[in-house]
Amino acid sequence: MENFKHLPEPFRIRVIEPVKRTTRAYREEAIIKSGMNPFLLDSEDVFIDLLTDSGTGAVTQSMQAAMMRGDEAYSGSRSYYALAESVKNIFGYQYTIPTHQGRGAEQIYIPVLIKKREQEKGLDRSKMVAFSNYFFDTTQGHSQINGCTVRNVYIKEAFDTGVRYDFKGNFDLEGLERGIEEVGPNNVPYIVATITSNSAGGQPVSLANLKAMYSIAKKYDIPVVMDSARFAENAYFIKQREAEYKDWTIEQITRETYKYADMLAMSAKKDAMVPMGGLLCVKDDSFFDVYTECRTLCVVQEGFPTYGGLEGGAMERLAVGLYDGMNLDWLAYRIAQVQYLVDGLEEIGVVCQQAGGHAAFVDAGKLLPHIPADQFPAQALACELYKVAGIRAVEIGSFLLGRDPKTGKQLPCPAELLRLTIPRATYTQTHMDFIIEAFKHVKENAANIKGLTFTYEPKVLRHFTAKLKEV
């Protein structure tokens, strides 16, 4: 099979979900009713759902079978210990707190690390800044509601869709150290390493870059949290692109990666393939005080620390999904599916970010140059794509980035991207061809697509519930 141009999906489909077809008139009415926000569409009105890969894909038969082992005890569940054992074996982290999803972990660890920095280093809350290669939207939101400014320090190649670069998700190491010195190390409560970098297009971070980042963090005694939603995809890219690790297994690369952080926070709904679940884990006893504080907050916000908002069966499923998501054949297929979609779009003249791990990212700024950033070209493109073909995608640009919480001004965004997120083991190559054909129609009408303005704008994470209208 090595010499075939395209390998088929490396799985058999056993259960299907019917979807309905709709008319153009129906979809136009639906998107207006949703306030020109695809997040607010009803799923039954969506033909191909590319909004997110978070909990929207298929599960493996081994994961489904594992659910039958679920121990639903309120405390001390066997299923918790099965999950904690998987974490130890895969990541090498000694302490595990399950959460209902990634943001459950964020709402716990962020205030704990801020408090720790304040007590131990005299952090000034009016001056505190956290750094990342690029914060995920909820991580940014939780930081901001805790009064912490966020700063993304990414390399110059990250958002240039005309440039091909192996590790576009990398930290700008000079920018990171310069930023720490500017705000004062004691005012930096944490650094978040996001793997892969979602906002940059699912772009990987090299192990060399993670090592260097961690060295800087240790120099200033700043905790590092690995945002681990797509840890397996990042490991696959390291194997493919970082020569030193080409003969390593995904499991070996993953274990090595997590030496360069103190904690991990994970939305397990991505690479661990579960419909619901998250993790907050601490590497060793050097952060045992943080683990203890986080367990206390978990009781209040998520549930008892040995279930953390998850039923026993869900913890068993996650314990298996962490392994299944690292399967090399599976990862090769998944990355190739994204590459196929990107290649097809670029063949018809639709400029994309280089293919990443979980989605194709269309450069809406180049497709719709007549729409200024403050009228959200990628959001306008998302609405047009839905009207044309019933495809739901998500804006990754100025609309998502939001306003500066101190000044109220729109934050400058490095690129206006539309994310076509591919759920795991859900859509076939035929679906990819349909998406490409839909963009042909969108491109033909691109000059007539209008910008958008708010009719309702929430103050935090506005992209989830805001409503807009055409200008």
From Swiss-Prot:
One GO molecular-function entry: tryptophanase activity
SUPFAM superfamilies, A to Z: PLP-dependent transferases (SSF53383)
Modified residues (N6-(pyridoxal phosphate)lysine): 270
Recorded superkingdom: Bacteria
EC number: 4.1.99.1
Metabolic or biological pathway, per its Swiss-Prot or TrEMBL entry: Amino-acid degradation; L-tryptophan degradation via pyruvate pathway; indole and pyruvate from L-tryptophan: step 1/1
InterPro entries from the UniProt entry: ArAA_b-elim_lyase/Thr_aldolase, Beta-eliminating_lyase, PyrdxlP-dep_Trfase, PyrdxlP-dep_Trfase_major, PyrdxlP-dep_Trfase_small, TNase, Tryptophanase_CS
Keyword Transmembrane helix: no
Keywords associated with the record: Acetylation, Lyase, Pyridoxal phosphate, Tryptophan catabolism
Modified residues (N6-acetyllysine): 5, 115, 156, 450
CC cofactor: pyridoxal 5'-phosphate
Keyword RNA-binding: no
Catalytic activity field: L-tryptophan + H2O = indole + pyruvate + NH4(+)
Family (UniProt): Belongs to the beta-eliminating lyase family.
Oligomeric form and interacting partners: Homotetramer.
Protein name per UniProt: Tryptophanase
Gene name, Swiss-Prot/TrEMBL: tnaA
